[in-house]
Amino acid sequence: MYYRTRTYIAGDWDNDKDAVDALHRWNDSSRYGLSFSDAHELKQARDTSLNCSIKRSLAERLDASKTFILIVGEHTKELRAGGCQYCNSYNSYWGTCGRGHTVDTRSYIDFECEKAIRDGLKIIVLYKSTVVNRSKCPEVVRNRGIHAPMEKWVGNTLYWDYDSVRNAIG
């Protein structure tokens, strides 16, 4: 059993890792006022683990969290990784798991968002963009929580918008 003191960050780790890295840089720097304990530091799941094992590990991290941050990029809404149908143990004819686990066809993102809502976590949706475009956000959190852009234009140069993120996180 964990105390809910952590911040859980979800997103497209293949395409939007730079946004996650920006959050960590702001958190680790004494120059910025962002301060959070990352829930992903609690327990690691190997990328070679079964989807159901990874979801169990994600659930443990969410159980220790009070805040859920979702990074929304170009492809976040379309991500499908994590569903049982993509596991070698899944029998598509019968719709069952060959290892006897419960079948869960949700992606990791959908699983994380739904658990954050069910657990009553503070939800923050940060868009890897200069604008909030809710059509890119997974439907389950589209109208929940605080939504804010992570980027801004200064002249002709695109920068991370620390002030927008800090105001959203609080």
Segments from the language model and where they lie:
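Conserved N-terminal substructure of TIR/SEFIR domains
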Residues: M1-T67, G170
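C-terminal interaction surface of TIR/SEFIR-family domains
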Residues: R4-R6, Y127-G170
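Short beta-strand/turn micro-motifs composed of small residues
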Residues: G11, V72, V125-Y127
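Surface-exposed, flexible loop/turn segments at secondary-structure boundaries
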Residues: N15, T76, V131
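Short aromatic-enriched loop/helix-cap "lid" or pocket-rim segments at secondary-structure transitions
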Residues: D21-A22, G83, S135-E139
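Conserved BB-loop
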Residues: S30-S57, E74-S89, W94-V103
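Short, well-ordered beta-strand core segments
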Residues: F68-I69, I123
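Amphipathic helical hotspot of TIR/SEFIR-family domains
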Residues: L79-R134
